[in-house]
Amino acid sequence: MSKAELKDFTFKSRHIGPTNEDEALMLQHLGYENSEEFISSVIPNEIFDSENNVVSIPDGCDQNKALKEINIISKKNVEHRSLIGLGYHSTVIPPVIQRNVLENPNWYTAYTPYQAEISQGRLEALFNFQTLISELTGLPISNASLLDEATAAAEAISLSLAVRKNKNANKFLVDQEILPQTFDVLKTRCEPLGISLEMFENNNFEIDKNIFGILIQLPGKNGRIWDPTKIINDAHKCNAIVTIAIDPLAQVLIKPMGEFGADIVVGSAQRFGVPIACGGPHAAFFATKEIYKRQIPGRIVGQSVDVEGNQALRLALQTREQHIRRDKATSNICTAQVLLAVLSSFYAVHHGPKGLKQIAENVVKYRSNFESILMNLEYPIEKYSAFDSVDVYCSEASEVIQLASEEGYNFRVLPIGSDFENAKGFGVTFDELTCDEEIYTLHQILAQVKGKKAHDLSNFLNENASLVDIPLREKSWLEQSVFNQYQSETDLMRYIHSLVSKDFSLVQGMIPLGSCTMKLNSAAELLPIEWREFSSIHPFAPHAQLAGFHEIINDLENWLSALTGFQGVSLQPNAGSQGEFAGLLVIRSWHQSLGEGHRNICLIPTSAHGTNPASAVMSGFKVVSVKCDEYGNVDLEDLKNKSKIHSKNLAALMVTYPSTHGVFEPNIREMCQVIHQEGGQVYLDGANLNAQVGICRPGSYGIDVCHLNLHKTFSIPHGGGGPGVGPIAVADHLVPYLPGHSIIKCGGEKAISAVSAAPFGSAGILPISWMYIRMMGSDGLRKASSIAILSANYLAKRLDPYYPVLFKDPNGLVAHECILDLRPLKSQLGIEVEDVAKRLMDYGFHAPTISWPVAGTLMVEPTESESLPELDRFCDAMIGIREEIEQIKLGKIDPINNPLKQSPHTLKRVTSDDWDRPYSRKEAAYPLPDQEKYKFWPSVSRINNAYGDRNLICSCPSVQDLEDINSV
């Protein structure tokens, strides 16, 4: 077999949908002879990297070779049993959940459930998650996940600030037992907003009218628990909002914090069946009172009804969010941790309230038994009530930690952040994996250090240990049927699949969402993240034990630097929104270092992603909008005028490239020069980087800092709305300001404080992007970008006669996505863009992005992974819908009772006995030829969005609630 033939079996050919023959046909359709001629017509000459000199990235390889290489790297991580705690705990993911959810592309390749009619399964799993959190916390409103516990705590400060009664109050107090990584992120959030962040000790503080909120960590970082009633009452006396950061496993036993009077409760659901994975990804949660439902950050799943009166779920209260409210949004959160929330919700379904209680009680028992062992061996310990942890300060600390390490255990080094050689004490945290044998091993270690003999464990094991010094949960909880009827694996497996059968993902077909890059997430890329060498590692483990992770991180930093033309990268931000925040803070710190901290104006085009203005406000900047011209480009004259007007205070320009209008703006280099001449910096939103990789480099045409979405461009799956990774790449002068961390050394010499709880963010999924880049190589990455652009232009050319493409460059071309203008259909026939989106479901497609960045349009992004037949199938669907619209125009179809207005059509409706439509059942359900062979059915009809917001229900009713309802 020739070398040319072998190339067809490389990963590149598996990842890229169109074959070489397909590519030639598409180029011919567009009037080009070869891909280089085509790409040079799309990319402005002044930024086009015609040589593709990314020499630091190895050549692409097949899947087996890459898997062998990363397996060798993984073995460099030392897999010790972690008893470090500090918010990260070993847990068991039930195999039935691992197999049927985590490893199932139906779950991990779906997108955020904006199209609710084809997302009912995922929405139900998230509804269960919200119910779980509400039951744990005793608060009625919970969101569908946040990025990590530290971010959730920071969002609590934002909510507290927004609803404060004394608008001059600027002081927020935090418990001295707060997790150090959480305090780190709180400092980052508070400083740009002028919030005074102070610690209080011994559960006491002075009542002060300038305090607008307090945060209590309960249990504390050392596991301590106590009754927070008094401090909550004291805080409320000065009108302060009370946030409590909880451990969900401890909360299984403890009286819900909402019943103590807490206003907000946050935490991480990691203990509920999600691996530590060197710090993430994990689903955080945020619960609050009913009165704050319109200020809560992140997405909320709410109950509504469809047009036929059937119960349905949807994303509720979206007007709070950044894609609508922009700089006035409650948060900049977009991507969250949906897949991880789904895992945790199924973990709770699997165990039920009895199983969760047993796990929690075992933790309490082993902690109590270990304390007895310490006392027997005469280790000096401070007696206090605690859930899972013990801290010991003693002269033998270094020896204990060293011996434990030799036996395969990692203890917490005290003070936190110290090396074991300088340890003043050690801490141990117990978890779901703790067992009698482990306690005996720890007993032997401690006895050996004291020169004593370990005694029979029966002297210390107390099966009846319980929590004291805090009221416990008395009422029944998690009584909802979903948490009590799926404890057998057969039933749970069937329940999981009953949900996923309601969801549209890449398994069912193309998801052509503009600005979302729904490309292939290959099986080979995902395999390593489940290996214990990656999944079991604690982020605060000794540096030498993380050699494999450091190699992955270093490779990615170098590769991403080379691909973007920058000199430094931080992988810490765990979503694009946090990348924006981090990048803007880096710019802010650089200005401050020059004595120009007064620079606070951020110019943002009106077409920008909603996260841009929201992130700018969070970073302490004032947003000034820049107009766009009729061609979708940033209005260069308006940019120059605004830059001049705000010259003394200009901090930055935030720009997306290619633009959110789907074109490569020819003046990008000049735009950068305009900003630099006035002393500002240029921030690039990397949401559209999939059109640039290997073709042009932002660092080479004037950009100073850029965030990248590894969950878009570099193949990490969207997971139905997370996880994500949003690293930032920066020019040389900004490298010293890359984010640091209070426990693990990272970042620049003048680092801003952390933007995520873990030093390397969601490190557990970085192997996915490592595999993608390693297998694609520089040529493959360039090819992927080229095909992504080609596919978008092919769609644009085919669909332009039916739906005008709104923005094109001077050559009549688009970038990697295009905007289809449906506005004339509304003005002429009353056909809404939503009608077309819902009708696409009947044709077997997820809709493109709706009404953004221009109302009444569809933004289509096919990516490089979709084959030519799939692209044609989508075009046929859109053309078929246009023909249906033409029938309405000609008066052959009723303007209201037609396939578009009545879409989507469910199996239940199509097979009902009372079909009363003037069109046939076949026209409703099988509009494309051969659809009878395979059909994805929406599980509900069109949902009433307004009803859901007016009647907000975001958790399952309890048995008592149902009884109360039925008695009315």
From Swiss-Prot:
* Family membership noted in the UniProt record: Belongs to the GcvP family.
The cofactor(s) it depends on are: pyridoxal 5'-phosphate
Swiss-Prot/TrEMBL keywords: Oxidoreductase, Pyridoxal phosphate
Documented EC number(s): 1.4.4.2
Catalytic function, reaction form: N(6)-[(R)-lipoyl]-L-lysyl-[glycine-cleavage complex H protein] + glycine + H(+) = N(6)-[(R)-S(8)-aminomethyldihydrolipoyl]-L-lysyl-[glycine-cleavage complex H protein] + CO2
- Kindly list the organism's lineage: Bacteria, Bacillati, Cyanobacteriota, Cyanophyceae, Synechococcales
Its subunit composition reads:
The glycine cleavage system is composed of four proteins: P, T, L and H.
Under the GO molecular function aspect, what terms does this record hold?
Answer: glycine binding; glycine dehydrogenase (decarboxylating) activity; pyridoxal phosphate binding
What is the documented function of this protein? Answer: The glycine cleavage system catalyzes the degradation of glycine. The P protein binds the alpha-amino group of glycine through its pyridoxal phosphate cofactor; CO(2) is released and the remaining methylamine moiety is then transferred to the lipoamide cofactor of the H protein.
Residues carrying N6-(pyridoxal phosphate)lysine: 712
Spell out the protein name for this chain.
Glycine dehydrogenase (decarboxylating)
What gene name does this entry carry?
A: gcvP
Q: Name one GO cellular component term.
A: glycine cleavage complex
Q: Which SUPFAM superfamilies does the record associate with it? A: PLP-dependent transferases (SSF53383)
Question: What is the species of this protein?
Answer: Prochlorococcus marinus (strain NATL1A)
